[in-house]
Amino acid sequence: MELCEKKYVVFVNGDAMGKSIQGAGGALVLGTVFNTILTRSSISLHQNKKPEKWLEEAFLELQKIFESFDGSMYISIVLGLVEENTGLLYYINAEHPWTVLYRNGVASYIEEELTLRKIGIPENEEHLVIKNFQMLPGDTIMIGSDGRDDLLIGKEENRVINEDQNQFLKRVEEGNADLRKIYEKILKFGVILDDLSLLKVTYNPEDNKTNE
């Protein structure tokens, strides 16, 4: 996507509240609205915006639509833009699991606290914060739903639900930030109890592109 004559990679990862049909409905709403936003953004009239403004407007549009469901449908998301030439990341996190940085073989979280609630919760826009993070060449940003953490672990007679969010960092390192390998490492560690989706964005300036 192009904004103010600069090219950006756009990404979103979300997890709708609810089971079965309700959760699937939330995902469909997110996909439909997000596709509309992207289509509109391809029109030159809408390209003269700063990335922060684009994210704010996208959030407000999603917030308005999900809030119209009167509490029956919320969704957590990470929505972001990466400037292709500089690797500067702009993003919002609406009560989604923390964003992971994989740099030089080490995984860590780039967030320490979350201030924004799930999209659809009334008055959520008052807590909107557009966050920035400078990616370096070779960096990978990893985002995933809470299925990455909600795992049944241990032996059959003493199984418990994992409560250690740092375990996911270990899986990222073990899998060298490869999505398929990370998924396989998660399966070896425990039984997945919730929906799992994973997304990564890697900054490769030498290729003059950012891979997703």
Predicted stretch roles:
Residues 1:
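Alpha-helical phosphate/pyrophosphate-handling elements in metalloenzyme active cores
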Residues 22-24, 89-90, 100-102, 108-112, ...:
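Extended hydrophobic-aromatic, low-complexity segments
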Residues 6, 77, 112-154, 189-192:
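Acidic loop->beta-strand submotif enriched in PP2C/PPM serine/threonine phosphatases
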Residues 5-21, 91-95, 132-156, 200-201:
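Conserved beta-strand-loop-short alpha-helix elements that form
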Residues 16, 107-108:
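GAF sensory/regulatory domain recognition
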Residues 22-48, 135, 139-190, 206-212:
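Active-site-proximal, acidic helix/loop segment immediately C-terminal to a metal-coordinating Asp/Glu
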Residues 4, 21-105, 114, 128, ...:
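Catalytic core of PPM/PP2C metal-dependent serine/threonine phosphatase domains
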